[in-house]
Each structure stands twice: as C-alpha cells, then as structure tokens.
A protein has these predicted regions:
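Exported/periplasmic ABC-transporter solute-binding proteins
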Residues: 22-73, 80-83, 87-262
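N-terminal secretory signal peptides and thylakoid transit peptides that target proteins
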Residues: 1-14
Length: 262
C-alpha cells in the first residue's frame, strides 16, 4: 500500500508528466515523449475502430515513467525509448515478460534553428565547439534519458564529448531539448530524427553514424498490474498495418511484422 500511495508524490515532482488517474474502462499508456505524434494518431484510430475510449497517454522521459511505474502509478502499457529502462522495470517484476517486444527503431541527429547560419557540420570536437560559439548544446539528461544517453555515447565515440561536456543545456526529455533549439535558446541540439522532422523551426545539420551509439530500440510491454483486456488489444494494434503507417509517416523504423488489427 505504501508504494501505491507514494507514486502521486513522485508524479507531482515531475511536472512534464500529465495527470494519470485511470478512468473507468480507459487504457492508460506510459510512453516516451518522442512517440507523441505517432501514438496520438494511433490511439485515435484504435478508438475509432473498436468503439473504445481513446487511451489516456502520459508522455515523458522513459526514465521518469519507469520510476513512476516502480512507485505504483496505474499504467497498463509502457513504451520505452531504450532497452535499459524496460530492463529496469522487468528486473523489478513490473511488466508481463511474455507481452514484451521490440517495436521501433530511430536515429539521432544534430539540429540548429531553422534560420541559423550554421552549415552542415562534421561531428568532431573542434568543429562542434566552434559552432556553439559560446552557446550551449541542448540535450536531454545525459545520465538518465535515453536520447541523452545515446547522444553522449555518440559524442564520446566521435571524440567530441570532452569539448562540449561543460557546455550543455540539459532538458527533462527530448521534446524539451527540441524546444530550446526551436526557440533559438540553444544554437545546437541532439534529438531523434523523428522529432526534428516534426518541428519546422529546426533543421538537421548532421546525422550521427549508427555505429557511434547503442542501437536505438523502443520496446513495449504490458505492466504486471494491468488487468485490462483492452490494453492487450491496444498493444496488439501497435503491430497492425495501420499503426505501421503512422509510425513510418513520423520516420520511425518498425521492427515487427504487421499483424491483423483486432
């Protein structure tokens, strides 16, 4: 009971996570912030097809969501932006292992404001630091948020980390990091390619080699405490041809074969 009562305090400490009280009969999904555009569209399509209430989706950093699940937050599904945080909740016995699968792939890119004079960059310490011109590199938290961890790993592999590590503007999730660049508050940032494509106020100035960081994989699973049959149906729908179309439209790589939608 203590954990069940304590999750609310954690939720209040994470202002980017919306209210997550489970409405009667409504599927509750915790999903990485980078999934918002695609998943909102998919949830609406599932609701239209089934006649069920549109799932209530809370978007935030995978790290924040995993911690909320650990504290007993009422979620039916968890969609993480990396394997580490799904492994974390798996290790805590908080998901149903048979339901888990790898759903999507993504890429990370370096972005600048759309009106920036920054040209296409080679990602190395000297050029990246020079392009910052005294400003800061916008990244999601490099120690806990998946896109921040991927970005740090890539910068280390490419020999640029030591030149920029003291010039970071760290945000709570990828959308917050994206916003800093879109507003011109940071001259450069590292985000997923899907987020860059969705924001007209930024442009891509470099793409990170896929071998410069761990594979970007989005796993999905039912939580251990979910008793909703609709949650299983929605999870299955994520593998449907209709969902594939939404994911691919946003630039994700779909890692599962399409299944017939229920």
């Amino acid at each position: 009971m203590v954990k069940r009562r304590s999750w609310l305090g954690l939720a209040l400490a994470l202002p980017l996570v919306p209210g997550i009280a489970r409405a009667q009969g409504t599927v509750v999904v915790f999903a990485a912030a980078s999934l918002k555009n695609a998943l909102d569209e998919i949830a609406a399509a599932w609701s239209k097809d089934t006649g069920k209430p549109t799932p209530k989706i809370s978007y935030a950093a995978s790290s924040a969501l995993a911690k909320q699940i650990e504290q007993g937050a009422p979620a039916d599904l968890f969609l993480s932006a990396d394997l580490d945080w799904m492994d974390y909740v798996t290790g805590k016995n908080l998901i149903k292992p048979p339901s888990r699968f790898n759903l999507l792939g993504n890429k990370i890119v370096l972005i600048a404001p759309a009106d920036s004079r920054t040209a296409t960059l080679a990602i190395n310490g000297g050029e990246l630091a020079k392009a910052l011109a005294g400003g800061r590199l916008s990244m999601a938290n490099v120690d806990s948020v998946p896109v921040g961890k991927y970005g740090k790993a890539a910068l280390q592999k490419l020999g640029a980390w030591n030149d920029v590590k003291d010039h970071l503007a760290q945000a709570e999730n990828v959308r917050a990091a994206l916003l800093l660049v879109a507003r011109g508050e940071a001259p450069l940032g590292i985000v997923y390619s899907t987020d860059a494509a969705a924001e007209p106020k930024v442009r891509i100035v470099a793409a990170f080699p896929e071998d410069s960081h761990p594979p970007i994989i989005y796993p999905a699973a039912l939580t251990k405490d979910s008793s909703s049959s609709d949650a299983k149906t929605f999870l299955d729908f994520l593998r449907s041809a209709k969902a594939r179309g939404s994911f691919e439209k946003q630039g994700f790589t779909v890692l599962v074969r399409s299944a017939s939608a229920t």
